[in-house]
Amino acid sequence: MSSIERAMERMRRAPAAGAVDVTAAQMSEPEPAPASDPAVALDLAALRELGMLTPDADQRALQEQYRLVKRQLLARAFRPAPDGGNPVNLIQITSALASEGKTFTAFNLAISVAMEVDFTVLLVDADLTRRGLTHLIGLQGRPGITELLAGEVGDVGSIVTRTDIPRLSVIPAGQGHPRSTELVASDAMRRLSREVATRYHDRLVIVDSTPLLMDSQAATLAAHVGQIVVVVEASRTAEMPLRNAIALLDPATADVGLLLNKSMARRRSSYYDDAS
C-alpha cells in the first residue's frame, strides 16, 4: 500500500485569513454526545492489512512520515487569528483526481494526531459521493453529514461516533443523496464546519473530501476550511490536472500544501528495518 515520502510542501505563501480564536464562551456548551452509544471498536487488524496506521502496531517508518506531516499542520492549527477567518484547525484532505490516496492520508493523519497527548481529533467523511472513509471504518448505515444537512437529524452530537481509540471521533458521510453537492454548498454546511472546529480548544478536525476535479463539492468545501492538503500520487498525477485543481483553491482563505504519496517507501522502510 501507499506511503509518504515527505511532509507538507508549501504550494503558495499568500497570507491566509487564519483561524477563529476560541473563547471560553464558545466552549461553555459541550457538544451533545450520544451517551447511550458505546464507542465503536475499529478492526485494527483489518486496517493494518490495508496499510493503515494503527496505534497498537510497530510501524515506525509510517509513524515517522505522518509525524512530519502533522507537526506542520499542528504548528498552524491553533494560532490566534483575526475575527472572521476560517478555522485553521479545520483541515481538508483532497486530491486532483480519484485514487491518489486522500482517504488513506486522512485516516492515517487522524490516527497520528490521536497519538498526541495534548490534542483530540475529529475525522469527517465529507466525500458524499464515494463515502470511502465511512466504509473503511465500518460506519455504513449510521446517520452522518447527509442526514444533518438534509434536516433529518437535529444536532451535530447525534452524528458524532466515538471510537475505542482514545481522542479519536468520527462523523460518517451518511447515506447517498441525489443532491449531495447542493447539501455541501448549503449554509448548513458552513455552520457545521464552524461548529465542529470551534467547539473544543484542543480539537483538530480532518475532513476527507471529494477530489477537486471530479465534482464541485471539494472546491465548495474549501471555502470553509483553514488548511488544505492536496495529495499528489508520485509518478501518476500529471502536472496539468494538478495545476487545474490548485487553481480552484483560494490561498487567501486557506493555507494550501502538497503531500507526495507513494514515493520512496522502500528507502524509508529500509532505514527503520536496519535499526530493528
Model-derived features with residue positions:
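Conserved catalytic-core segment of NTP-binding enzymes
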Residues: 135, 167, 181-276
